[in-house]
């Protein structure tokens, strides 16, 4: 297959504003070190321009931009500034250490913004555009000017301001859909008409900046590129003001996957996209929605039996890109109530089981029954089903009864009765809290060296009568076993979950012994 040479005129500059517009998202504030870490990651993955912050906003923002400017190896480091000279001068000082720095200054141009926000006449705004860009150009050759709320600005006035900004020295013109109001066709046409109308439009690169208020930020961004823009302003995970910004990972992969319709290219290393998503999610404490395009937990996960069957036969049946291209190790066939026999058989083979047709049928029937009761069915659950079928028995350790004494004074005490292989054992133990006392009881009754890795509790439903669902994960000999249990009594649910994980460890150990016997015999 012949590869078409990349043309510079089809190159799209990726301008990441996660550290500025993204951090303006309520609750997404990052620490100084977190900003440096995110900036380093953006620099490494090939982002062309990093908008590192708004230096005039605070001393902390200034210091972050200044330090990022010092450390950047590849990216242009940009600072945001209002149209005032004080803002611009402060921004210039912040980006000074950068090998390549940019000042991004902006001013509102729409009637509603000029009247209510700026309380200025159009003539005053026009003069301020010239004044601010001129001031910025005195500090650096790389100046970006944004017409805030461009999509609601009168066209003739927008063109006048753009022409003046370019004449004053702006090298990039950004026309943002500030409130996410535009639709793709009109956004594309705006860029086409502006570039056609403004006489010196060829002297600057045009840029898109789209918000997601109507869910069209990515579509609008690509429409703007189709209209002649060659810079996209975006954020990791699409975080930003209100409903967010266009998501960098979606834009980059859209250009990569649909080269037939989007014949543009960029410098992003796509295998870092998932890592970037997780880094920003951790820094902002904003979880990524499971069904988020490209980087969501379910982006390459399949539960439907029909889909799993297709994926097993050929991944192209239900995936338009490979998970490896975005830094995911592989496709996940999620086992649940929608899974069919083909999916279960594939999972059993992955786990190393070789079962007869009758055994598979037995496991499948019990798997479907379990999937109807459980939201998530994990590998450990399937292993437990198989172990139960192969061992012709149920859990060897069962909870018979539990009594816990807890209060504000004195140690917490638990008394537990277990059925261990048909033998009743009773023990009492104390702990630093009732849950600790319960787990200490189990350790006394069934001595083991498994380590507790996870203990989580949440209410299954609302109200004071809600069942508590407890998850416990135990680590033993390099393998983790997870179990869940639900009960109106949180302590009973905790005991059941712990015992469930312990039973899986016992079953796994017995299975390992069975597998070792044929190997020894063969060696003999």
From Swiss-Prot:
Q: Which EC numbers does the record give?
A: 2.3.3.13
Regulatory domain: annotated segments:
398-524
- What Pfam families does the annotation carry? HCS_D2, HMGL-like, LeuA_dimer
Residues binding Mn(2+), per UniProt:
21, 209, 211, 245
What is catalyzed by this enzyme?
3-methyl-2-oxobutanoate + acetyl-CoA + H2O = (2S)-2-isopropylmalate + CoA + H(+)
Specify the Pyruvate carboxyltransferase domain's residue ranges: 12-274
Cofactors needed by this protein, per the record, are: Mn(2+)
From the UniProt record, give one GO term of the biological process aspect. L-leucine biosynthetic process
Alphabetic keyword roster? Amino-acid biosynthesis, Branched-chain amino acid biosynthesis, Cytoplasm, Leucine biosynthesis, Manganese, Metal-binding, Transferase
Instruction: Kindly give the InterPro entries that the UniProt entry links to this protein.
Output: 2-IPM_HCS-like (IPR050073), 2-isopropylmalate_synth_dimer (IPR013709), AIPM/Hcit_synth_CS (IPR002034), Aldolase_TIM (IPR013785), LeuA/HCS_post-cat (IPR054691), LeuA_allosteric_dom_sf (IPR036230), LeuA_bact_synth (IPR005671), PYR_CT (IPR000891)
Which Cys pairs are S-S linked?
none
Q: What is this protein called?
A: 2-isopropylmalate synthase
Record lineage: Bacteria, Pseudomonadati, Pseudomonadota, Alphaproteobacteria, Hyphomicrobiales
């Amino acid at each position: 297959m012949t590869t078409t040479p990349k043309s510079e005129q089809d190159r799209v500059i990726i301008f990441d504003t996660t550290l500025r517009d993204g951090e303006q998202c309520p609750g997404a504030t990052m620490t100084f070190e977190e900003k440096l870490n995110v900036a380093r990651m953006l620099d490494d993955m090939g982002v062309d321009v990093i908008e590192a912050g708004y230096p005039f906003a605070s001393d902390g923002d200034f210091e972050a931009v200044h330090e990022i400017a010092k450390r950047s190896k590849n990216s242009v480091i940009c600072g945001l500034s209002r149209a005032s000279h004080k803002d611009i001068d402060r921004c210039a000082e912040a980006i000074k250490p950068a090998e390549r720095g940019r000042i991004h200054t902006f001013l509102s141009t729409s009637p509603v913004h000029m009247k209510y926000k700026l309380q200025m006449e159009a003539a005053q705004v026009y003069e301020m555009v010239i004044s601010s860009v001129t001031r910025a150009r005195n500090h650096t050759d790389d100046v970006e000017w944004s017409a805030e709320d461009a999509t609601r600005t009168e066209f003739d006035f927008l063109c006048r301001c753009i022409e003046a900004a370019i004449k004053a020295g702006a090298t990039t013109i950004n026309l943002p859909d500030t409130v996410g109001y535009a639709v793709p066709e009109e956004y594309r046409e705006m860029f086409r008409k502006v570039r056609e109308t403004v006489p010196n439009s060829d002297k600057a690169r045009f840029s898109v900046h789209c918000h997601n208020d109507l869910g069209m930020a990515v579509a609008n961004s690509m429409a703007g590129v189709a209209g002649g823009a060659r810079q996209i302003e975006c954020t990791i995970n699409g975080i930003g003001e209100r409903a967010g910004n266009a998501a960098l990972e979606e834009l980059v992969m859209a250009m990569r996957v649909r080269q037939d319709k989007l014949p543009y290219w960029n410098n992003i290393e796509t295998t870092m996209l998932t890592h970037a998503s997780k880094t920003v999610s951790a820094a902002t404490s904003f979880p990524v929605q499971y069904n988020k395009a490209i980087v969501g937990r379910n982006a390459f996960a399949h539960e439907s039996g029909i889909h799993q069957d297709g994926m097993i036969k050929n991944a192209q049946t239900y995936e338009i890109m490979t998970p490896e291209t975005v830094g995911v190790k592989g496709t996940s066939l999620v086992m649940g109530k929608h899974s069919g026999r083909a999916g279960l058989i594939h999972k059993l083979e992955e786990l190393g089981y070789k079962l007869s047709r009758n055994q598979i049928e037995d496991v499948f029937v019990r798997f479907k029954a379990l999937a109807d009761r459980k939201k998530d069915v994990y590998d450990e659950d399937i292993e437990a089903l198989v172990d139960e079928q192969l061992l012709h028995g149920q859990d060897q350790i069962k909870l018979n009864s539990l009594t816990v004494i807890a209060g504000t004074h004195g140690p917490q005490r638990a008394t537990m009765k277990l059925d261990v292989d048909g033998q009743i054992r009773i023990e009492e133990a104390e702990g630093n809290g009732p849950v600790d006392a319960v787990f200490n009881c189990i350790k006394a009754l069934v001595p083991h060296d498994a380590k507790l890795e996870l203990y989580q509790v949440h209410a299954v439903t609302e109200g004071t009568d809600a069942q508590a669902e407890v998850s416990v994960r135990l680590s033993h000999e390099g393998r983790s076993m997870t179990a869940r249990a639900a009960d109106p009594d949180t302590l009973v649910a905790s005991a059941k979950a712990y015992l469930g994980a312990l039973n899986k460890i016992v079953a796994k150990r017995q299975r390992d012994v069975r597998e070792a016997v044929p190997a020894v015999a063969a060696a003999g």
